[in-house]
């Protein structure tokens, strides 16, 4: 099941007044998968050897720790190659914090315990539990440091671009393989393909990447008071 499908399954349950608890794990996994897709690229830097790879990795980590904003376009296709969903959005990153915006969703994590999103379409404000397990998966620094969790192989190197395949060493991952393409000399990727266990493929193209040194942790705090007309759904 693709990221967008999981989100919309949860939204449909809310809209139809169904019990949303069974859908919670799907949505949480989807959000973590999306952040992983956006950030997995720098892990491929260790497919190279020597001080150059170390320097690039440290530069990528510092870039995210200091603040960065990424614009992306994504498309999800099924096993038959049919497009299920396409969208554009923005993700802002500052150390452990992120703010992800796409379609009618505004998803926030403050790096500590506040994990929430606002659904503009249904006018819902949803709160999740930012426990240690979720923090570990969503923390960009920890993700950048987890290169040993993937088996990496170089697929191609041409026209100033390197393409790598990353497969998880641990079983049970929602993604069977990442295919990551990035320009030489750049820490963050330009294209990421995530192939799910079910065979769905989500292709993310990074259309813009800029430093965002003025980001503050307060920018990632989302409260119900910002949406006075919204229904608050507390799943903590």
Where are these regions (language model features)?
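N-terminal leader/targeting segments and the immediate start of mature chains
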Residues: 36-38, 42-83, 94-97, 225-236
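Short beta-strand segments that buttress and anchor functional surface loops
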Residues: 72-74, 99-103, 163-171, 191-195
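Gram-negative bacterial Sec-dependent N-terminal signal peptides
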Residues: 2, 24-43
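Flexible, surface-exposed loop/linker segments and immediately adjacent secondary-structure boundaries
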Residues: 129-160
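An acidic-aromatic
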Residues: 85-137, 197, 202
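N-terminal secretory signal peptides that target proteins for export/translocation
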Residues: 1-24
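Non-transmembrane domains of secretory- and envelope-associated proteins
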Residues: 49-50, 158, 169-176, 184-236
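A short, surface-exposed beta-strand/turn
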Residues: 93-94, 108-110, 178-191
């Amino acid at each position: 099941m693709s990221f967008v499908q999981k989100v919309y399954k949860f939204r449909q349950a809310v809209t139809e007044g169904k019990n949303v608890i069974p859908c919670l794990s799907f949505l949480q996994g989807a959000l973590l998968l999306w952040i992983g897709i956006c950030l997995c690229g720098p892990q491929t830097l260790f497919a190279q050897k020597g001080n150059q790879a170390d320097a690039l990795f440290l530069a990528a980590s510092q870039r995210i720790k200091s603040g960065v904003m990424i614009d992306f376009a994504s498309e999800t296709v099924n096993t038959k190659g049919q497009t299920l969903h396409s969208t554009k959005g923005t993700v802002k990153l500052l150390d452990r914090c992120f703010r992800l915006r796409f379609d009618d969703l505004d998803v926030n994590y403050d790096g500590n315990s506040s994990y929430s999103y606002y659904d503009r379409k249904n006018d819902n404000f949803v709160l999740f539990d930012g426990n240690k397990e979720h923090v570990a998966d969503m923390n960009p620094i920890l993700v950048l440091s987890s290169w040993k969790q993937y088996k990496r192989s170089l697929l191609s190197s041409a026209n100033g671009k390197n393409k790598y395949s990353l497969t998880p060493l641990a079983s049970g991952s929602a993604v069977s393989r990442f295919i990551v393409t990035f320009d030489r000399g750049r820490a963050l990727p330009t294209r990421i393909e995530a192939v799910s266990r079910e065979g769905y493929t989500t292709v993310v193209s990074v259309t813009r990447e800029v430093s965002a040194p003025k980001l503050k942790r307060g920018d990632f705090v989302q409260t119900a008071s910002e949406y006075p007309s919204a229904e608050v759904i507390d799943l903590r």
